[in-house]
Amino acid sequence: MSQPITRENFDEWMIPVYAPAPFIPVRGEGSRLWDQQGKEYIDFAGGIAVNALGHAHPELREALNEQASKFWHTGNGYTNEPVLRLAKKLIDATFADRVFFCNSGAEANEAALKLARKFAHDRYGSHKSGIMAFKNAFHGRTLFTVSAGGQPAYSQDFAPLPPDIRHAAYNDINSASALIDDATCAVIVEPIQGEGGVVPASNAFLQGLRELCDRHNALLIFDEVQTGVGRTGELYAYMHYGVTPDLLTTAKALGGDFPVGALLTTEECASVMTVGTHGTTYGGNPLASAVAGKVLELINTPEMLNGVKQRHDWFVERLNTINHRYGLFSEVRGLGLLIGCVLNADYAGQAKQISQEAAKAGVMVLIAGGNVVRFAPALNVSEEEVTTGLDRFAAACEHFVSRGSS
């Protein structure tokens, strides 16, 4: 008989790059989770915007089990039917002509940055290697992507970092204009900065970046790892803004619960890549592709996408009511079901404490830095689950305020 597993085992056995909650979830269904002791939680964290259809969705389980009964993996020396069907679905639903599959958002962004540099190298010469990104951005944890992310706390201990990366102020087109030049090969931007505080870009900002990229022959990369696959109420956020990138990265919700990532791009951009210029062993494996194909089928419908917008209203209305009662937040912002509650000055830096109180009350929420409580629930979360979860969140806020902010 195997030994019991406890939260303390994490501290004994794991490399300490995470500080997980004191409880261990063991079962999930829809937007509910249960821990080892049987306590129920309403899940508004969604696996950090991953569980777009909730936990253990029956049609995703069926797709996974059906493919698992056939074969799981062959490597990139062979293709497979599920990945080709998935590629066609993404192409038909977006601006893209070509797709590269991988296993995560970081890998997708790594592929995008490499493609952008190769495109510039082949078309204009090796001098055109600059990348413009934005302060407080997050693009992944590889050395290249963490350098593109504009958060020094994540990169400063890993020098020397890849060169020729500049960081402009987000939502400030004048700052971007001052840094871009003809040696810039790409601009990478999140339509909503997720880890940076749930900060939506303005339409004028993204349109301005499109114009700057066109003027300087640079590729525009939208990192839609967090905003993609219905999260904003559109299949991808670029559709909400009406600004089309040259490359788009997607992951998280694309797999529902299953690890998968993808780079979407045009025929022109893809043409610089040839056999061997990039690759991955597991990317586009049949298991991930079968699940992701079903995810797209279920999410890319008017009913689901319009439902996201309706659920946004449920959350914002209730969160504003909670805030009116307890006065914690200076702003509730975001699009669709990516929502951030910004702490006011009296409670600055204490988002983590509020999330911990929420877990005690039986609701899981995220943070986005020290000052923002973040919500990224399943896109099909029910009205009853929203009501119950936010009642628990209100109780957590009451307890947090009553015990003092220290």
Swiss-Prot record:
Q: Does the keyword Isomerase apply?
A: no
The gene behind this protein is astC
Q: Which Pfam families match?
A: Aminotran_3 (PF00202)
Task of the protein: Catalyzes the transamination of N(2)-succinylornithine and alpha-ketoglutarate into N(2)-succinylglutamate semialdehyde and glutamate. Can also act as an acetylornithine aminotransferase.
Q: Which GO MF terms are attached to this record?
A: identical protein binding; pyridoxal phosphate binding; succinylornithine transaminase activity
Q: Which UniProt keywords apply?
A: Aminotransferase, Arginine metabolism, Pyridoxal phosphate, Transferase
The family database entries (InterPro entries) matched by this protein are listed as: Ac/SucOrn_transaminase_bac, AcOrn/SuccOrn_fam, Aminotrans_3, Aminotrans_3_PPA_site, Class-III_PLP-dep_AT, PyrdxlP-dep_Trfase, PyrdxlP-dep_Trfase_major, PyrdxlP-dep_Trfase_small
Among HAMAP family, the record links this protein to: ArgD_aminotrans_3, AstC_aminotrans_3
Cofactor(s) the protein needs:
pyridoxal 5'-phosphate
Tell me the domain of life. Bacteria
Catalytic reactions on record: N(2)-succinyl-L-ornithine + 2-oxoglutarate = N-succinyl-L-glutamate 5-semialdehyde + L-glutamate
Top EC class of this enzyme: transferase
Sorted alphabetically, which NCBIfam families does this protein's record hold?
arg_catab_astC (TIGR03246), argD (TIGR00707), PRK01278.1 (NF002325), PRK05093.1 (NF003468), PRK12381.1 (NF009047)
Which cysteines does the record link by disulfide bonds?
none
Quote the EC number: 2.6.1.81
PTM N6-(pyridoxal phosphate)lysine: list the residues: 252
Species:
Shigella boydii serotype 18 (strain CDC 3083-94 / BS512)
Q: Can you name this protein?
A: Succinylornithine transaminase
